[in-house]
Amino acid sequence: MAGLLDGKRILVTGIITDSSIAFHIAKVAQEAGAQLVLTGFDRLRLIQRIVDRLPEKAPLIELDVQNEEHLNTLAQRVTGEIGEGNKLDGVVHSIASSETGMADQPFFDAPYEDVSKGIHISADSDASLAKALLPIMNPGGSIVGMDFDPSRAMPAYNWMTVAKSALESVNRFVAREAGPHGVRSNLVAAGPIRTLAMAGIVGGVLGDQAAEQIRLLEEGWDQRAPIGWNMKDPTPVAKTVCALLSDWLPATTGTIIYADRGASTQLL
């Protein structure tokens, strides 16, 4: 992957721990030559310690996608990090809700407030991020969001599946709005990865039931995938994201690239 992203300036959102998909995207992007700006929400000191584990140093700025001031000043703050006159070549949206009702409660029991907030954070924020950053993106740039195939009702995933369906629709509109700027917008639909978010689902109020559902999901995914699946290895997903951030898919926008080793194409 060396050189694939040489000279590109990329903003990556969503690093929480070193198990985060966003962390591995950042790692692979740096190894491919990218200069990064990272964003974090809450617990910035903790996130900074995680960021310090990356191969290269990268600035970390605060971003709460529910905070209008954060969004309104984002382009200015990013420019402060990459230098006046420089622009971004890529943006990674790897933000999802941690609201209790989204995934770790029975579907019908989810509070409206959790669902509303969760869909805003997980889906609407893709449009908010694009709106904030398009003015400082170079033509030929790429916006990539993280997806999880929502075409079926996933056990224990509940309203997060609905949020991902919303994200897929938002992505199509972002692609349309970004097109005149010469910027592409796509999603990567990953198979299940053992991140902090997944651990939260397993450890939620469904308890043993959710843990068993996730275990069955993991086993079923590996069995369906023609080339197998490893929930502990996010690197193949990160490489797919970096391919979309590169110049090698200039005619691809408004769509979804699957990084699930083919599991979504198989019935059994």
UniProtKB/Swiss-Prot annotation:
<feature type="binding site">
    <location>
        <begin position="20"/>
        <end position="21"/>
    </location>
    <ligand>
        <name>NAD(+)</name>
    </ligand>
</feature>
<dbReference type="InterPro" id="IPR036291">
    <property type="entry name" value="NAD(P)-bd_dom_sf"/>
</dbReference>
<dbReference type="InterPro" id="IPR002347">
    <property type="entry name" value="SDR_fam"/>
</dbReference>
<feature type="site" description="Transition state stabilizer">
    <location>
        <position position="157"/>
    </location>
</feature>
<keyword id="KW-0444">Lipid biosynthesis</keyword>
<feature type="site" description="May act as an intermediate that passes the hydride ion from NADH to the substrate">
    <location>
        <position position="148"/>
    </location>
</feature>
<keyword id="KW-0560">Oxidoreductase</keyword>
<comment type="pathway">
    <text>Lipid metabolism; mycolic acid biosynthesis.</text>
</comment>
<comment type="similarity">
    <text>Belongs to the short-chain dehydrogenases/reductases (SDR) family. FabI subfamily.</text>
</comment>
<feature type="binding site">
    <location>
        <position position="164"/>
    </location>
    <ligand>
        <name>NAD(+)</name>
    </ligand>
</feature>
<dbReference type="InterPro" id="IPR053410">
    <property type="entry name" value="Mycobact_enoyl-ACP_red"/>
</dbReference>
<feature type="binding site">
    <location>
        <begin position="64"/>
        <end position="65"/>
    </location>
    <ligand>
        <name>NAD(+)</name>
    </ligand>
</feature>
<keyword id="KW-0276">Fatty acid metabolism</keyword>
<dbReference type="GO" id="GO:0004318">
    <property type="term" value="F:enoyl-[acyl-carrier-protein] reductase (NADH) activity"/>
</dbReference>
<dbReference type="Pfam" id="PF13561">
    <property type="entry name" value="adh_short_C2"/>
</dbReference>
<feature type="binding site">
    <location>
        <position position="193"/>
    </location>
    <ligand>
        <name>NAD(+)</name>
    </ligand>
</feature>
<dbReference type="InterPro" id="IPR014358">
    <property type="entry name" value="Enoyl-ACP_Rdtase_NADH"/>
</dbReference>
<dbReference type="GO" id="GO:0050343">
    <property type="term" value="F:trans-2-enoyl-CoA reductase (NADH) activity"/>
</dbReference>
<dbReference type="GO" id="GO:0006633">
    <property type="term" value="P:fatty acid biosynthetic process"/>
</dbReference>
<feature type="binding site">
    <location>
        <position position="157"/>
    </location>
    <ligand>
        <name>substrate</name>
    </ligand>
</feature>
<comment type="subunit">
    <text>Homodimer. Homotetramer.</text>
</comment>
<feature type="binding site">
    <location>
        <begin position="95"/>
        <end position="96"/>
    </location>
    <ligand>
        <name>NAD(+)</name>
    </ligand>
</feature>
<keyword id="KW-0275">Fatty acid biosynthesis</keyword>
<protein>
    <recommendedName>
        <fullName>Enoyl-[acyl-carrier-protein] reductase [NADH]</fullName>
        <ecNumber>1.3.1.9</ecNumber>
    </recommendedName>
</protein>
<keyword id="KW-0443">Lipid metabolism</keyword>
<keyword id="KW-0520">NAD</keyword>
<comment type="function">
    <text>Enoyl-ACP reductase of the type II fatty acid syntase (FAS-II) system, which is involved in the biosynthesis of mycolic acids, a major component of mycobacterial cell walls. Catalyzes the NADH-dependent reduction of the double bond of 2-trans-enoyl-[acyl-carrier protein], an essential step in the fatty acid elongation cycle of the FAS-II pathway. Shows preference for long-chain fatty acyl thioester substrates, and can also use 2-trans-enoyl-CoAs as alternative substrates.</text>
</comment>
